[in-house]
Amino acid sequence: MSKGWRKLFVSRGDGTKNSLKKTLKVPEVRSPLLTNFHRWAGKERVLKLTDKEQVTEAVGNSSWDLSKNLFANLLASPMRSDKASRFKFPRDLLIQMKLVQTGNENPGKLATLMPLINMKSGKSSSYVANSLKIFKGKKPGLGQLVPTAVNDSGIANISLSDIVLDKSLFTEKHQEELLQCIENCMTQLVDRRKSSVPVVVEDWDVVLTYDHNNDNDIELVRLKQLPKDPTVIILNLKVVENDSIRALINDKLKNHEVGVVLKFLKDERLIRLVYSLLNFSK
C-alpha cells in the first residue's frame, strides 16, 4: 500500500495538503443571556414602553392594582443574598441581621448579633431566610451569619469572639417579639375601627382569621359569595395559639363575615408582620 494511504480517510479532491479536511470548531457563544445572566440578579429591570398603545397591548387596560397586592410588594423589594445559602431573594422575604452594641449584661463582649423586625439601612447588615426551622437546625452556625462589613456599626476592630451569638434571639424570642408587635398593632386598630364605616371587600384585600378548621395558614381565595367575586389573601393566625390574638380577630376587630378585612395601603405594617410571623413559624 502506498505511503499516503492515511490521506484517503481525511482528504478531498486530489489528496494534497491544501485539500485536507479541517477540524470544525463550534463558535464561542457571546449571547449575554448565557454569559452574563448571573450578573443580572439584584438589578432593577424596567420595561420601557412610551407609546400608549404599546402599554395597553402589553399589560391591558388594567394596572392589576399591584400597589395593593401584598405578594407583588414583597417580590418588588431589592434583592439580597441569603448568608446561609448564598442565593439571592427579595429582601422582604428574609430576616435582616445587624450587630448591636452590647451593654453591661454581657461583660467582655462588644456586640450582639440581632434579628431586626423593622429593617434598617446601612452596610453592616446580613440576611438569612425567614424560617424557624433553619435556626433550630445545626447549620448554619450563627458565626456564619455575622455581617461582613461592620464599618458603620460603631464598633471597630471586632472579632468573632467579641460577639454574642445567642440562638434564642432568633427562635423563641424573635417569635415573641413579632407576636407582641402584631398585638400592639391590632390594639391600635381597635380604637380606629370604632368610628369606621362598613367595609367593602375588594381584590387583594387581606383577611385575618383565627380558624382551626382551616388547615392553611396562607391562601389566595376568590370569594364567589360576595359581589364582584373579589380575590383576597387569607392569613390564618391559628398557629400562634394565643388567646389575646384569637379574641382580637374573632371578636373585637372582626368587621366582616369573612374575618378581619385589611387594606394593604392602610394596614401595611400589620399585614407584613402577620405574613412574616406565619412564614417564620412554618
Swiss-Prot record:
Belongs to the RRG8 family. Keywords: Mitochondrion. Coiled coil: none annotated. InterPro entries: Rrg8 (IPR031415). It comes from Kluyveromyces lactis (strain ATCC 8585 / CBS 2359 / DSM 70799 / NBRC 1267 / NRRL Y-1140 / WM37). This is Required for respiratory growth protein 8, mitochondrial. GO terms for biological process: mitochondrial genome maintenance. It is found in: Mitochondrion. GO terms for cellular component: mitochondrion. Required for respiratory activity and maintenance and expression of the mitochondrial genome. Its main location: mitochondrion. Pfam families: RRG8.
